[in-house]
Structure formats: structure tokens, C-alpha cells
Amino acid sequence: MSNEEQRSRTDGRQPVGTVVFDFDGTISLGDGPVRSYARHAFARLPAGLRERAVRTLDLYLGGAVTDDGRHWNDGYDVVSDMCAGHVPADGLQQAYLSSRDELARGLVHVDMPQGLPGFLDDLGSLGCVRVLLTNSPLHGVRETVGRFGLEGRFDLIVDGAGKPGRWGDHIAAFDRLSGRGRLLSIGDHWDNDIAPVLAAG
């Protein structure tokens, strides 16, 4: 695992297993981050296409069937699709990084699930290793964790995780960390967060 922040366990107990949390859409809730990304990305589109892109994203995030009839995994897929052929990959990456900077600065509104701090405390009391595993960069994640009052409640934070492709590496590392072959993954994206763990047994 790379790009990780780790807090050592100080109670001396043998961990009983690992509980892995995703970040966006799991402990950080709301459309603010993807709307921020869209605002920066769509600004690079011609005016007519920009209006259509904004309308399509609004429909998708509102749960309506889009006028294109497409199916996306999340709002980020919508933004990328609407920009295809008009905004190069480096332009989309810059838009994404700008949105994460706004998240880090507290300019994007997000919420956490009710009761999350207590839940993490309970997991720690049970001897679980609590991991935050995200494909997002640390910038934006770290600051949000702090604003949520979750500092010290994760034993390990791994950013730039490369899910789903690198799950095998992560599972092996978590098994070494906990000394157990028990892992629970909690996330909002089936392909990224759930299916690879089920497939690994």
C-alpha cells in the first residue's frame, strides 16, 4: 500500500479483523464534490454542450432517467461521458484536483452518516482494525476527516488505492496488519468496494 497514514494501536490487543470503509459516498455524503468537479469540467465545454451537460447531471443526481438513456455508475461517470471528445484527460484531471482542493478548504458541503464516530469507537473497542481506503487523493480526505471529528478513529488511511484492480494487494496487506483473515468492506460502489472482496472469499 502506498500514500498511507497510519495510527499505531496502543492498547496492545491482538486485532480480531479489519473493517474497510470507502470515502466518497460512504463516510462523506452529498453531491457537493461531484458538482464541484462538474463545474470545473463543464467550464471547458462550448456553451450549448455545457447547458446539456448540466441538465443531464441534474437529472441523474435527482434520480430521473436522463434524456440520453445512458446508465452510469455514479455522477463522475456522467461528467466524464459528457466531456468525452471535448475535454482532454489532463483537463478532467485538473478539474478533479480543483474540486478536491475546494473540498479540503471546506468550500464543498458534505455530511457524514449519523452515528459514525460512535460506530468507529465501538469497532475499536472490539479490536477491529479500522481502515479508510479511497481512490481519492489524501488532499481533501484528510481535512474532511478532521472536520467530521474522526481524527484518530481510523487506524489506517490509504489514498490513491487503485480500486478495484489493487484489492488483492490491499487484502494481503490488511491480513498482515491484523494477523487475521477476516475483512469486511463497507462502500457504496459494488464493483469497487464489495465485489472484489466477495470474490476473494
Regions found by a protein language model. Name each.
Residues 3-61:
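Active-site neighborhood of HAD-like aspartate-dependent phosphohydrolases
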Residues 15, 20, 103-131, 168:
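Short, acidic loop-to-helix structural element flanking the phosphoryl-transfer center
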Residues 20-22, 133, 186-187:
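Generic enzyme active-site microenvironment
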Residues 32, 115, 136-137, 162, ...:
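Short beta->alpha linker loops
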Residues 55-105, 114-125:
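A metal-dependent, Asp-based hydrolase signature
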Residues 115-122, 144, 173, 196:
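A short acidic, amphipathic alpha-helical/loop segment
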Residues 131-184:
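Substrate-recognition "cap/lid" segment bordering the active-site pocket of phosphatases
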Residues 188-200:
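Acidic, divalent-metal-coordinating active-site segment for phosphoryl/phosphodiester hydrolysis
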